[in-house]
Swiss-Prot record:
SUPFAM superfamilies: NusB-like. Coiled coil: none annotated. This is Transcription antitermination protein NusB. It comes from Glaesserella parasuis serovar 5 (strain SH0165) (Haemophilus parasuis). The lineage of its organism: Bacteria, Pseudomonadati, Pseudomonadota, Gammaproteobacteria, Pasteurellales. Keywords: RNA-binding, Transcription, Transcription antitermination, Transcription regulation. One of its GO terms (cellular component) is cytosol. Involved in transcription antitermination. Required for transcription of ribosomal RNA (rRNA) genes. Binds specifically to the boxA antiterminator sequence of the ribosomal RNA (rrn) operons. Belongs to the NusB family. GO terms for molecular function: RNA binding. InterPro entries: NusB-like_sf (IPR035926), NusB_fam (IPR011605), NusB_RsmB_TIM44 (IPR006027). Pfam families: NusB (PF01029). GO terms for biological process: DNA-templated transcription termination; transcription antitermination.
């Protein structure tokens, strides 16, 4: 099955955001290294950059809107789940042209690829509660 350019952008953004979170390097350094080292064919590059930069620029706001819907402390969250939730939180809050069902479904699919066995269920549960709070349902 062919993966859409936006899905590829989301998958790559999650990988780059994870690298940023773990390495504590600047997002500019992470982006440069990522696009140099990874196969970016089939990626919606403008959307990749928008997701990457937008998530980092708004990370405190995103963390604040996610926090009430988490069942554990921030430092107890799996880093990949945290990264996927941040990206989806960015899309739900700031990318209003993306239907909320699409943002949630894409996050679930990305969690199936990169998360642990039940990550997609956790991501779905959190985002399903967040969307109405952002008036996206």
């Amino acid at each position: 099955m062919k993966v859409s350019p936006r899905r590829r952008a989301r998958e790559c953004a999650v990988q780059a955001l994870y690298s940023w979170y773990i390495s504590q390097n600047s997002i500019e350094q992470v982006e440069l290294a990522f696009v140099t080292d990874q196969d970016m064919q089939g990626v919606d590059m403008p959307y990749f950059r928008k997701l990457l930069r937008g998530t980092v620029e708004n990370v405190d706001v995103i963390d604040d809107i996610l926090r009430p819907y988490l069942d554990r402390a921030d430092n107890e969250l799996d880093p990949i789940e945290r990264t996927i939730l941040r990206l989806a939180g960015y899309e739900l809050k700031f990318e209003l042209d993306v239907p909320y069902k699409v943002a949630i479904n894409e996050a679930i699919e990305v969690a199936k690829v990169f998360g642990s066995d039940d990550s997609h269920k956790y991501v779905n549960g959190v985002l399903d509660k967040l969307a109405p709070a952002l008036n996206r349902k």
